[in-house]
């Protein structure tokens, strides 16, 4: 429910993690 995951760049964070 994090607002950050609602952003279009959320999938990018998955790759960066």
UniProtKB/Swiss-Prot annotation:
Keywords: Amidation, Neuropeptide. The modification Serine amide is found at residue 17. GO terms for biological process: neuropeptide signaling pathway. This is Peptide hormone 4. It comes from Periplaneta americana (American cockroach). The lineage of its organism: Eukaryota, Metazoa, Ecdysozoa, Arthropoda, Hexapoda.
């Amino acid at each position: 429910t994090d607002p950050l995951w609602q952003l279009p760049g959320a999938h990018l964070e998955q790759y960066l993690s």
